[in-house]
Amino acid sequence: MRSFLGGMRFSVLLLVIGLVSLTALTIFWIRVDGANKEDTAISDFQPGQDDFDHTFSRYQMLVNTVVVPVSPLGAGVHYKRAKELRKDREEIRANLERVSRAQFDSWSNNQQLAFLINAYNFMTIELVIKHYPVRSIKDIGTFFVGPWKQKFFTLFGDVRDLDFIEHGLIREMFLEPRIHFALVCASRGCPSLQKEVYVAEKLDEQLDFATRQFLQDKAHNRIDHEGKKLFLSKIFSWYEDDFLLFSDSLQEFALRYMGDNSLKSPGAAALNYRVVYSDYDWALNDVQQ
């Protein structure tokens, strides 16, 4: 009887050990499987499966509707009209915000930069519309948290501000001074929002055009040969280090784009002219105002 009971106890012990082992193994696989699912959720982009519209066709349609020429070299934005196109803006915003960092990292440099410029400019419109009507973008926010520090959109899964795109990504990743004439600040003193969205295939040409257009607009930049002065936008003061990465002086960079003869005699003399920074007009670039 004792041997029988002993055998039963031994069998029960083996059964308990087996059940414990099975339970532990099951928990292990659940955790592993769960971890794999979490990894997939965090980065569900698979290389070679990029479905992003790099022509930005929806955004281009919006730009066609709201960007209005105000001078031969300048344009404004019809913010009231843009505000009315809520569904279009929601779709554009959703397309930009759903891009993951893994997907972004799989793109070419030109695709990345075109995306960031377009995202910055579109989100600038969104910021103005959120607070519209305003007299200036600088009226948005507080003394301590200005418009460019307002966290109001999602990028790569986190809530971001405009400064993150410009300083945390574009200026950090790309040594490209011409971006300062592609990024807009919703003000009359800043470069105009172009009628054509930025695309990878034409990016160099588009950046050149935007730079040349702004530098040749005498409302922002001009040469005073009589006074031997070169009047430049304050953009050149704020981002002087960026421009000097590829030029010996601010004069050299500016004159390269100010006209076909700016670096030829007698224009070449302007290389030695004193730089004077023009007043910056922070009034909203609204065609309604």
Name every feature range the model reports, one short phrase each:
Residues 19-29:
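Hydrophobic alpha-helical membrane-insertion segments, chiefly the h-region
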